[in-house]
Amino acid sequence: LLKAHPEFAEVLIDATEQEVPQPTDKLKRKHAYSGKQHDHTIKTQIVATKDLVLHVFGGLPGSLHDMTVLRASGVMYRIPLAVKVRVDKGYEGTENAYPEADVQAPIKKKRGQKVTTLGKAYNHLLSVLRMPVEHHFARLQKFGCLAGLWRGPQSGHEDIFCVVSGLLNFRATGRFELA
């Protein structure tokens, strides 16, 4: 999609989690447990612009770190070098892992130090610029299948996420109007 639309100057990457029933198998239970959500979840990552969801990668266990999901998706290799990539604190180390990419990540405090006033201002500006990806998640979660407990097969979660994202993209481009 980025090749078809070279006008995209920036993309936003973020991940969300959706609650799943507690697996009966002990190993699956361990992999599905998200320490962040304190529940068993499925993780999905999106790459979006201000208006459109460009890429969905998910159906992964909630225990995975955001950076691990980013590496597994391989999406950073498909983003042109001229495009800015904005990420949140969950993607710490993206600048080092992909030095050729133009990655903008928040400044985290180092052990025993504080974030400077300039660093705090930068983080605030970055969070404001990243707000559209959070709005995408809010719109996606208006669909009941993505809002509450996911009871379907883990393998089908990414497909449903893609379908709902496509519907929202049609609506955003004016080609489709939801009743």
Predicted regions and their residues:
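Short, well-ordered secondary-structure "scaffold" segments embedded in the functional core
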Residues: 1-179
